[in-house]
């Protein structure tokens, strides 16, 4: 076990705990003690997801919710939801509703009625009184100006002290306190922190000992505030009280919360409560190993949803941010897992310590996989058609579109789609006549030395009989290019250009089957006319 003093004004991010060494990446972390034993619980657990509605859900928050959910489901335990909304000034309109909406959309279902911390002030007051009466907390009447001076002077010390308070108010007598209360002087409630914060065990990282840097010639104290001057609890107090009262056994949260953990454990000890097990999961980073942010790839889940990301793809994507499935299953399933499969195979022993790199190429790989599964399922295929129809109806005459046609396109050609939002861009030619204005396709079409043969080919092929099926079309096309000595590539490129006006496109047989014989013959004829005009 290694003890580190934390050289920041408040607890810094784990990646900056000491110069050149941090918790991230943790492959060779100084704070790690390899745990060989099985860390996965054998009994049912109670976990929670505790977001603050100060913004909309992002990838990091969704991963935290998912891991807590999967651990609960895997052990036949319970997964709870708590809204940490005590910081009223930072609340964002619509953020609370967004949390409910995204969890439901992702099929992350909580087991009990959600708890809102803003509705539990009386509960927190009760436990603050317990700490005050036992001398483990005290009222602080210091002004903002005095506190700012203390922080400034602490930083001027050599070495500087990251703990800044001098416990002036901890020594006030009862009469002084009563007098200040009677005068209506604003106050906070501070926790009387221990001389040293307790060492704790993180199930992923092992034993950790984090202490604030202090100057022993000018003693200051890291007495965190439990109740703000507006009488609302701080995150630290509400977090500990709620986790205890909710019976939470395991807390999975981001690595950035590691520096807060000694404070929380000290509070548990002050109340005489048992602590939950802690698991701090690695940071999400870009492919270049930069911390993910709104400017660097951490889009809200709502944005991803609008872009056409499917919930099952997003869940699969997030599950692999810091967790590895059993090797035998990963090789068989190519890392594609349904929620039901994840609930079965999720295990804390699969958690990894290194930063999790977010590569959106992987997301679209998963999205394509799950989109194909939806297309092949009659029930979800109907839902996809429902999603597509409104946009088509806003563009085209109803005579050119139908639910049956859209379903047929998806079944025959949807294998090329990575997201349903691309349906129109990929398959517009099924709903409108070719414009023959795709420069790349036109160049390829007209630059062929076989233009005379192509003209002959289109003329012959533009005579399909009604009732000809896809297999017969394939056979006729093959016969045509074999008998006339054309190359297969040139034949199909010419037909695709005439039918769709683009290159590449769907398979020829599928295009003719969807367009119908009459429309296909018409387009082949128009393609021939275009060729003849352009070659004059």
UniProtKB/Swiss-Prot annotation:
It is found in: Mitochondrion matrix. CDD domains: GluRS_core (cd00808). GO terms for molecular function: ATP binding; glutamate-tRNA ligase activity; tRNA binding; zinc ion binding. Its EC number is 6.1.1.17. A motif ('HIGH' region) lies at residues 53-61. A motif ('KMSKS' region) lies at residues 291-295. Transmembrane segments: none annotated. Pfam families: Anticodon_2 (PF19269), tRNA-synt_1c (PF00749). GO terms for cellular component: mitochondrial matrix; mitochondrion. It comes from the Eukaryota. Gene3D superfamilies: 1.10.10.350, HUPs. L-glutamate binds at residues 48-50, 84, 235-239, 253. It catalyses: tRNA(Glu) + L-glutamate + ATP = L-glutamyl-tRNA(Glu) + AMP + diphosphate. The keyword Methyltransferase does not apply. One of its GO terms (biological process) is glutamyl-tRNA aminoacylation. Keywords: Aminoacyl-tRNA synthetase, ATP-binding, Ligase, Mitochondrion, Nucleotide-binding, Protein biosynthesis, RNA-binding. ATP binds at residues 58, 256, 291-295. It is an enzyme of class 6 (ligase). SUPFAM superfamilies: An anticodon-binding domain of class I aminoacyl-tRNA synthetases (SSF48163), Nucleotidylyl transferase (SSF52374). The keyword Thylakoid does not apply. NCBIfam families: gltX_bact. Belongs to the class-I aminoacyl-tRNA synthetase family. Glutamate--tRNA ligase type 1 subfamily. Present with 2940 molecules/cell in log phase SD medium. This is Glutamate--tRNA ligase, mitochondrial. It comes from Saccharomyces cerevisiae (strain ATCC 204508 / S288c) (Baker's yeast). The gene is MSE1.
């Amino acid at each position: 076990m290694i003890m580190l003093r934390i050289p920041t004004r408040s607890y810094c991010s784990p990646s900056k705990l000491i110069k050149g060494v941090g918790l991230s990446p943790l492959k060779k972390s100084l704070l790690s003690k390899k745990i060989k034993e099985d860390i996965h619980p054998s009994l049912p657990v109670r976990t929670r997801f505790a977001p603050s509605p100060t913004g909309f859900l992002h990838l990091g928050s969704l991963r935290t919710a998912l891991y807590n959910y999967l651990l609960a489901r895997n052990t036949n335990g319970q997964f709870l939801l708590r809204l940490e909304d005590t910081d009223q000034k930072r609340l964002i309109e619509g953020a609370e509703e967004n949390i409910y909406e995204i969890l439901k959309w992702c099929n992350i279902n909580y087991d009990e009625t959600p708890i809102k911390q803003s509705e539990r002030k009386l509960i927190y007051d009760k436990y603050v009184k317990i700490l005050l009466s036992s001398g483990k907390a005290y009222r602080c009447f210091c002004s903002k100006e005095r506190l700012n001076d203390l922080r400034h002077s602490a930083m001027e010390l050599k070495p500087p002290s990251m703990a800044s308070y001098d416990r002036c108010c901890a020594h006030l007598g009862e009469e002084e306190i009563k007098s200040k209360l009677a005068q209506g002087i604003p106050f906070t409630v501070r926790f009387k922190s221990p001389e040293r914060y307790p060492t704790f065990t993180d199930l992923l990282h092992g034993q950790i000992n984090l202490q604030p840097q202090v100057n022993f010639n000018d003693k200051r104290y890291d007495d965190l505030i439990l109740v703000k001057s507006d009488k609302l609890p701080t995150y630290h107090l509400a977090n500990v009280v709620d986790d205890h009262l909710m019976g939470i056994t395991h807390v999975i949260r981001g690595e950035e919360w590691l520096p807060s953990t000694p404070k929380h454990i000290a509070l548990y000890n002050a109340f005489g409560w048992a602590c939950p097990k802690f698991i701090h999961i690695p940071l999400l980073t870009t492919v270049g190993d930069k911390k993910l942010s709104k400017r660097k790839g951490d889009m809200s889940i709502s944005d991803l949803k609008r872009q056409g990301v499917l919930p099952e793809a997003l869940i699969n994507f997030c599950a692999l941010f810091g967790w590895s499935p059993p090797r035998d299953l990963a090789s068989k399933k190519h890392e594609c897992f349904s929620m039901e499969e994840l609930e079965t195979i999720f295990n804390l022993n699969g958690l990894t310590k290194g930063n999790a790199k977010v590569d959106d190429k992987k997301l679209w790989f998963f999205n394509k996989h799950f989109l194909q599964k939806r297309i092949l399922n009659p029930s979800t295929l109907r839902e996809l058609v429902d999603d597509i129809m409104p946009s088509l109806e806003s563009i085209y005459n109803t005579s050119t579109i139908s639910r049956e046609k859209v379903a047929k396109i998806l079944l025959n050609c949807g294998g090329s789609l990575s997201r349903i939002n691309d349906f129109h861009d990929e398959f517009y030619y099924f709903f409108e006549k070719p414009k023959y204005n795709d420069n790349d396709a036109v160049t390829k079409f007209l630059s062929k030395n076989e233009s005379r043969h192509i003209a002959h080919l289109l003329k012959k092929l533009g005579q399909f009989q009604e009732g000809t099926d896809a297999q017969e079309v394939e056979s006729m096309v093959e016969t045509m290019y074999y008998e006339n000595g054309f190359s297969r590539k040139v034949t199909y490129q010419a037909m695709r250009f005439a039918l769709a006006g683009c290159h590449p496109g769907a398979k020829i047989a599928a295009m003719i089957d969807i367009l119908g014989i009459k429309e296909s013959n018409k387009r082949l004829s128009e393609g021939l006319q275009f060729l003849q005009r352009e070659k004059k």
